[in-house]
Each structure stands twice: as structure tokens, then as C-alpha cells.
Amino acid sequence: YIVFPTPAFDQIIAMRGVDDEVYLGGVEALNQGLHDFCSVDKSMLGTAYIPLGAGVDSALKVLERAIHQGFRVLLIDTIPPKNQVSFTHPDYYPIWARIQEAQLAVVLHIGATGAPYKPVPDELLDNGNPHSPQAHSDAPPNAMSYMGMHYNAELFLAAMIFDGVFERFPTLKIGVVELGASWIISWMQRLDQAHRAFRKLQDLSQVKMKPSDYVQRQIKVTPFAGEDIDWILTHGGEDLLMFASDYPHHEGTDDPIGRFEKTMSNTSEPLKQKFYTDNFKSLIQAS
């Protein structure tokens, strides 16, 4: 199972843009600490944070060390810093190529956006009613934050498709973690519609398949306890959906399996096998 460095990650990210040397040193310490923690149990797959926003050269150095340390899962940002090129720019091809060559899984996670985490503008919450603050947690603290938490991931993944990165690196795998899952069904439809609408207005020649086919081939997603698992599995998510508990965080509830199973009374055993086991194995490219 995948282990994330949530509290320590927030401390490191606080130095981003303040002191590059301290920030990159903190990234290395973060990765080393999680490597050491997970080394006692081979079933724990720690995530090495690769700071794409620090630039290609710095990110490649961290990536090479993570590969040497034996990491199999990489955590990345979704949105590049201001005045910097997209992570889909050809400058970043060496990073995607190295990840594909090493057969590593990439994961996106709530809060790891490349900028201060704020799923909705503060102004939308200034409505005259009491509300939970956005800050101090990467978990969605209110209904509006829940609605907006996956937007950055959608944009990043759409760029990976429309800019041809998934076409160029066809075995690259990306998991979307703790950002919900129900949205991905309509998102695939919107991807295909966007491609049809703009393929004659802009150069989308690097998109050789339906955009949703890249999703099916290269993306996995985890639901929150309480989402309708059977509906997602039977409406296009059969090969996308992976079980996650979010242990020990409260978002997973004290019985995530029970919550999931309440929505799976009509789910076939082959689909359950994909949800609980096979799709995760596909993400980490395990036999």
C-alpha cells in the first residue's frame, strides 16, 4: 500500500519560493525519512516527492536519487509556478522518459498542487454564513472545497493528454489519490467533446486516440468512502477505480470497506477484484 508524508510534506512546502537550498534539502530529507520508515515493511510503498516546480535539473537530481533508493511511487505537483513552463513542455520530457523507463507510478494527491492549497477562492466562502476555513488542512473542510478539490488534477491530466505526453510515453501511469472519483466519468466525456470541438481550431495532432482512451490506459483514481462504487465501476470506471482507506486520516472513516460495500451489493466479483486488487497492481506495474 502507498504511504504519503502528509504532515512533513506541509513543512517542506512552506519553504518553496523562500529559500531554494533549504527547500531542496528538505525534499531530500523528506524522501529519505519516508524511505527509512517504509523500509521495515516491504508492503509499504513510500512516495518520493519530485519537485517539478523547482525546474528540470533539480527535479531530475531528486528523481535519480529516488530511483537509487528504490522508490516505486512518485508524488508530484499539478500546477507549475507562475512564469514557468507547463510540466508537459518538451523541457520536461527527460523526466517523463526516466519515470517510464524505471516503471515508476506517479501519484497526484490533495494539497500537492504546486501552490498554496486553496480549492475555491476565499471570496466564494465570504457569504455571510459561518463556514469552515480552507487553511490548515488538505482535507476538504466544507462542501464548496469538496466540489473544487479535483479541478487542478483535471487540468493537469487534460494537459498530459492534449499536449501529447501520454501519447509519447504510453506506459506512464498516474494515480489520483484523495480527490474523489465520481467526477472522472463525466470528465472523460468532456475530454472527448473538447477534442471534437477544437481539433480543427488548434494543433491536436499529437492526440492519436480518443482522449478518454488515454484515461482508460494510463490513469487510476481512488474514491472517498461514501461514493457509489458500483455506479462508477459500471459507468466507465471498471479499469480506473482503486480501493483506498486514507488510514489513519478521518476522511476514510472507521470502516471504509463497510462504507464501500454498502454501494456494491450488485457488483460482480470480477469488478470487485479490479477495485480491491487488480487496478492497484496495474498502477504500480506489479504482476
Spans of model-derived segments:
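Active-site neighborhood of phospho(di)ester-bond hydrolases with catalytic His/Asp-centered motifs
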Residues: 47-48, 77, 109, 177, ...
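Active-site gating/metal-coordination segments in enzymes
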Residues: 1-156
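Aromatic-lined glycan-binding groove of carbohydrate-active enzymes
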Residues: 106, 110-120, 161-212
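Aromatic-anchored helix/helix-loop segment that forms the rim or "lid"
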Residues: 138-156, 199-230
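Short, well-ordered coil/turn segments that N-cap beta-strands
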Residues: 40-46, 69-74, 102-104, 170-173, ...
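Structural recognition of the beta-strand scaffold that forms the well-ordered cores
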Residues: 2-3, 75, 175, 220-222
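Histidine/acidic-residue-rich catalytic or RNA/ligand-binding cores of hydrolases
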Residues: 13, 114-127, 180-196, 232-236, ...
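Mid-to-C-terminal alpha-helical segments outside catalytic/metal-binding sites
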Residues: 32-39, 61-64, 163-164, 172-173, ...
